[in-house]
A protein has these predicted regions:
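Residue-level detector of alpha-helix initiation sites
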Residues: 52-54, 98-99, 195, 235
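A conserved FAD-binding loop/helix module that cradles the flavin
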Residues: 231-277
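Rossmann-like NAD(P)H-binding beta-loop-alpha module
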Residues: 75-128
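Short amphipathic alpha-helical segments
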Residues: 59-62, 104-107, 200-203, 242-243
Length: 281
């Protein structure tokens, strides 16, 4: 590992439970882990690289029963790739994010020998969210139907999921009466978006971007809090890991320069009105 050859201490199974900005600059952090209990470290520069988390069924307001058999796409990946378990046999996938599309293909292949199937992918928007290559390679090549402007409106089942109700929506994403359909299934996979993970930074109060849900940064990946950098999916959700690596390299270099007192100082390069700058989505 890189840390073994660079004299870097690496703490695993360790949680940051508190971050305090020091009056003279830098940060005090409180950690906890099974080996050391609670302990403290100080630093001159801090990089937020905490990634993002998946939205759950409670965050997309699906009504009905609360049976087992409802998983996020990341949970399904963990069961199959790391634990060797199949989460179900007949699947409905809500959302057309890249992870959901990849899981549609994977579930089709994994359940082919036991008669399983992916009943369809349902997307509330009028356009798919994932990359075109994943639409082609994961859905079209395997004959998996994609239903746009359609969402899962209710769950049905006692104990285990038995089926879902899907409903078409209008341009304002309101359910269209009379379009409800019942789809039998035992597993619902949610691929309904990712949210940058920044809750631990609340005590530092960096200015957050309402669109990306991550901190506002300058070209050096430094936030409005001096010495605090952000990169990867903690900054904003990236489609490609190449962009994650690029932002991480910039943040790491600039954080190191700040520690050496040789880097750019202050936040003068931060736009004064970043919300007025158009972005390509």
């Amino acid at each position: 590992m890189l840390t073994q050859h660079s004299n870097i201490d690496c703490y695993v199974s360790t949680f940051v439970i508190r971050i305090v900005q020091k009056s003279g600059g830098g940060f005090d952090l409180t950690f906890t882990n099974p080996q050391n209990g609670m302990f403290h470290l100080s630093c001159t520069a801090l990089i937020s690289a905490m990634g993002c988390r998946e939205r759950t069924d409670r965050q997309v307001f699906i009504h009905g029963d609360r049976p087992s058999g409802v998983f996020t796409a990341g949970q399904a990946q963990t069961f199959i790739n790391l634990k060797g378990y199949l989460p179900g046999k007949r699947f409905v996938i809500l959302g057309s994010g890249d992870i959901g599309l990849i899981m549609a293909r994977r579930l089709t292949l994994e359940t082919a020998s036991i008669g399983g199937s992916v009943e369809g992918v349902y997307e509330v928007k009028s356009k798919p969210s994932g990359l075109t290559r994943n639409i082609v390679q994961c859905l079209e090549d395997y004959g998996i139907p994609l239903h746009l402007s359609t969402t899962v409106s209710a769950l049905h089942g006692t104990g285990r999921l038995e089926g879902v109700t899907v409903t078409q929506v209008d341009g304002q994403m309101r359910p269209v009466a009379g379009t409800e359909r019942y789809i039998p299934c035992d597993t619902l996979i949610l691929s309904v978006g990712l949210i940058p993970e920044n809750d631990i930074l609340d005590s530092l109060a960096p200015v957050m971007d309402a669109r990306t849900k991550g901190p506002q940064v300058n070209q050096y990946m430094e936030t409005t809090v001096q010495g605090l950098f952000s990169c990867g999916n903690a900054l904003h959700v990236n489609d490609l890991v190449d962009y994650v690596s690029e932002s991480g390299s910039i943040a790491g270099e600039r954080a190191a320069l700040r520690c050496l007192r040789a880097g750019f100082a202050g936040n003068s390069a931060l736009p004064k009105h970043p919300t007025d700058i158009s972005i390509c989505a």
